[in-house]
A protein has these predicted regions:
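Internal active-site segments that recognize and position negatively charged phosphoryl groups
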Residues: 133-159
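A glycine-rich beta-to-alpha transition motif near the start of alpha/beta enzyme domains, typified by
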Residues: 1-111, 151-195
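Contiguous hydrophobic segments
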Residues: 74, 84, 125, 144-147
């Protein structure tokens, strides 16, 4: 039997397991994918195993929904912080969470929200074939915030079928390890919509 918790942050949902005892078999990627499957499992965007760390309050061992290892996830690390505080009954206002992309500092805001310092964006990454590519008639630029993202600016998000374009970009041969995809519409100089 597996005891798990379901958390969500800004539209992403996660299965979280207390794995400080290291009993969850991380080698079984099929099991991870099945847990995250929305039709045959619990359903989630990813699996977070909360583990002990000698460098931080805890380690976020993160897996994508298909069972592959990921460096981290910004929304996931905020959920991991909330889970850690509830699990340990801690009243800390700042946490350090170790990830494969380094240690992240999470601030517990008043009102129950969490902020994370993601660090400076990285514009060259082993998963980027070049600085930009035109795919599906959209120019995508690449940035890593601990994991790779393809960001494409469009005139109107309403004219784009993200459920069609997203998987084509994510699984494009240029990205053998896959890539996160965001489409951005500029509303004003200070306001952007993102899908």
């Amino acid at each position: 039997m597996i005891t798990f918790y379901k958390y969500h942050g800004a539209g992403n949902d996660f299965i979280i397991i207390d794995n400080r005892d290291k009993k969850f078999d991380v080698q079984n990627t099929k099991k991870i994918a099945l847990l995250c499957d929305r039709h045959f499992g619990v359903g989630a965007d990813g699996l977070i195993l909360l583990e002990s760390s000698d460098k931080a309050d805890c380690f976020m061992n993160y897996y994508n929904a298909d069972g592959t290892i990921a460096e981290m996830c910004g929304n996931g690390v905020r959920c991991a912080a909330k889970f850690f505080l509830e699990l340990t009954k801690s009243s800390k206002k700042e946490l350090l969470i170790d990830t494969r992309a380094g240690i992240k500092k999470i601030i517990c805001n008043s009102g129950g929200s969490f902020s994370v310092n993601m660090g400076a964006p990285i514009f060259s990454h082993k998963d980027f074939p070049k600085n930009s590519l035109v795919l599906e008639n959209i120019e995508f630029n690449f940035v890593s915030m601990g994991n790779p993202h393809a960001v494409g600016f469009v005139k109107s998000l309403n004219d784009i079928d993200i459920s069609n374009i997203g998987p084509k970009i994510e699984n494009n041969f240029h990205f053998p390890n896959k890539i996160n995809v965001e489409l951005v519409e500029k509303v004003s100089d200070t306001h952007f919509k993102v899908k």
